[in-house]
């Protein structure tokens, strides 16, 4: 296994990508209907894995339509919020958690940027309506605040 992903369908999601400081307010990115993708890469992951991940995640039928049928985020059409989530790689040890299996920060950042870029490319090439669809993403390596409105506890774990 080289990557772990959690998918959560959403009605609206808002992610703080820069905390407030003395000189500026917090910065946020947000999406409307679509999917939140939490992603963690493990040691040994390479860029070769990214196309398969993006194809699977954007085409899997996990989004519920108005009629109650399930479709992909591409066919919905919906937006995607990508959240780097290194804690998905944690393993319990005693009363704490260890993250020794996670990829190094520099390598992880490169894979994350490639993943985001390919998601953006796939979503933009699949515009099939006038509905605004977009890919937004969090900041790799930083703590972030997430606000999420979901249409049911509909969360899936996928490993690649």
From Swiss-Prot:
GO terms for molecular function: Ala-tRNA(Thr) deacylase activity; D-tyrosyl-tRNA(Tyr) deacylase activity; tRNA binding. GO terms for cellular component: cytoplasm. Its main location: cytoplasm. One of its GO terms (biological process) is aminoacyl-tRNA metabolism involved in translational fidelity. Its EC number is 3.1.1.96. Deacylates mischarged D-aminoacyl-tRNAs. Also deacylates mischarged glycyl-tRNA(Ala), protecting cells against glycine mischarging by AlaRS. Probably acts by rejecting L-amino acids from its binding site rather than specific recognition of D-amino acids. Catalyzes the hydrolysis of D-tyrosyl-tRNA(Tyr), has no activity on correctly charged L-tyrosyl-tRNA(Tyr). By recycling D-aminoacyl-tRNA to D-amino acids and free tRNA molecules, this enzyme counteracts the toxicity associated with the formation of D-aminoacyl-tRNA entities in vivo and helps enforce protein L-homochirality. Homodimer. This is D-aminoacyl-tRNA deacylase 2.
